[in-house]
Amino acid sequence: VAALAGTALSGEAGEKLLALGLAKLEQALPVTVQPDGGHAKRCPRSALELLFDLRALDEALVQRGQGAPESLLRAIDRLSGAVRFFTLADGALPELQGGEAGTKAYVAAAGAAESGSPPPASRNGYQRLDGRSLQVFVDAAPPASGAWSINACAQPLAVELLADGRRLIAASAWSPEAAGPQALRLVDASSTLSIADAACGEPLRGFRAATLGPRLVGAYETVEVRRQEAEGALLVELSHDGWVRRFGMKHERRLYLDIAADELRGEDALVPVDPQGQGEEGRRFIPFKIRFQVHPDVSASLARDGKSVLLRAAEDDHGWWLRNDAQSADIETSVYFQDGKARRAQQVVLRGQARAESGARVRWKLTSAAPGKG
């Protein structure tokens, strides 16, 4: 698209090339830009970059005195709505599905927020929950497939959390520009539940990757979402089938944002699909972990009870408690990418063990550590 914008500014010499390029663009846009404005890659950063390119092309056509195709204007309008939905409380983007957050100034330069209308609750397979101090963003759809999946991540039901306009729980922020391994596209590099050392989708390797690119294969195909809204509360219930074949378990995640109490209550469960079956692994006891990737500007420390975790940014007066009823809780080293460069970070790891016939359930809660709360 950027090259097409340059062609539009080249005068008569580029007219034939421009006409051909615009015709191909009109064919590609309905496939690339979904009806709700999301990019086919399901990457928020990809939607932003395409919006920049299409705006540049539109401006170049204006300078030529040529009207933009209706499909281009429609794509700009849809992408603007999606980027407005993706813009979080700190002015940057979610770091999911192969894209970094960007800066507040960079995201604002796209002009997507100019309408002033409130963002919708869901777009492009994501759910957004906005409270007084807390903001929750959750990946609620399967990753892209085929050629669109070169940057996709197999991280079902991953969440990002902001508190008081600051990032608290994040993703690893892996992107194609990151100097990090492809393994960071897997489930245990995100804020969600994983089983043993298994993956529910992974990138191609070796000859196939050299031929087709590091496409994601073997990923989960079904994510179910149910959302309920009431005065002072938001509830999103999700599940995915990524563990069914191997372990006979469905992962269910429940997120309840209590706006009045200014707290988030979460629940992660492994539920047997068939109590008589154990999946291909044939395990009776299934170890699992629930990870919360902590943003590098936030410190995590265990309380005396050995389970509760205090999450606190340097400029935060009080911090936030992450309480849970897991079998154990630990703080481990992790990595976070910013502008493609690795930063040392922490992750909270909740451990448990599910029985093949009955599953398991872990409850957790994020609440303010300010005096009189929590």
Annotate the PLM regions.
Residues 34-174, 345:
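Carbohydrate-active enzyme catalytic cores, enriched for enzymes
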Residues 323-374:
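Beta-strand-rich recognition/accessory modules
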Residues 108-299:
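Catalytic and substrate-binding regions of extracellular carbohydrate-active enzymes
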Residues 12-13, 63-64, 275:
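Secondary-structure transition/capping motifs at alpha-helix termini
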Residues 1-45, 49:
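Active-site lining segments of carbohydrate-active enzymes
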Residues 127-129, 234-240, 302-314, 322, ...:
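Generic recognition of long tandem-repeat/solenoid scaffolds
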Residues 279-334:
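Polysaccharide-binding surfaces and accessory modules of carbohydrate-active proteins
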Residues 239-244, 269-274, 312-318, 325-327, ...:
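Secondary-structure transition/turn motif
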